[in-house]
Amino acid sequence: MSRRNKNGPKLELRLNLSPPPSQASQMSLVRSPNRSNTTSPSSCVSSETNQEENETITSMVLVGCPRCLMYVMLSDDDPKCPKCKSTVLLDFLQENAFAATTATAANTRRKKKTWWN
């Protein structure tokens, strides 16, 4: 049985990012006499600095939800699937768990003996 449905809807994943501004456009913004030195309260720059002062930096984890079959990046403080709210998540990028699993697998491979050895 094929997993692809040829008549089904196509999934289009596209990330549109604007390129960084050139140095010439940045210099014109700095030299503009009409601009004030402070940012407006609704500006994203001013809100970012306010958030940095009020919040501590939290680490993010990349996990997979076995119920929804999707990967999400979540805060390490409260990891819950945003879709189904499940707390059973697979953290497959955790370095310590990966190293321990790899070392255990390597040891079991070394212990196996074949008839020609």
UniProtKB/Swiss-Prot annotation:
Motif (EAR): 10-15
Record note on disruption phenotype: No visible phenotype under normal growth conditions, but the double mutant seedlings gir1 and gir2 exhibit excessive root hair formation.
Positions in coiled-coil regions: none
Positions of the UniProt region annotated as Disordered: 1-56
GO biological processes: root hair cell development
Function: Acts as a negative regulator of root hair development redundantly with GIR1. GIR1 and GIR2 may function as adapter proteins that associate with GL2 and participate in the control of root hair formation. GIR1 and GIR2 may function as adapter proteins that associate with TPL and participate in the repression of root gene expression.
Main location as per UniProt: nucleus
Any single GO CC term annotated in Swiss-Prot or TrEMBL for this entry: nucleus
Keywords: Nucleus, Repressor, Transcription, Transcription regulation
Transmembrane segments: none
Taxonomic source organism: Arabidopsis thaliana
Quaternary structure and partners: Interacts with GL2. Interacts with TPL.
Key word Transcription regulation present: yes
Taxonomic lineage: Eukaryota, Viridiplantae, Streptophyta, Embryophyta, Tracheophyta
Protein name: Protein GL2-INTERACTING REPRESSOR 2
Domain of life: Eukaryota
Location(s) in or outside the cell: Nucleus
UniProt biased composition (Low complexity): 31-49
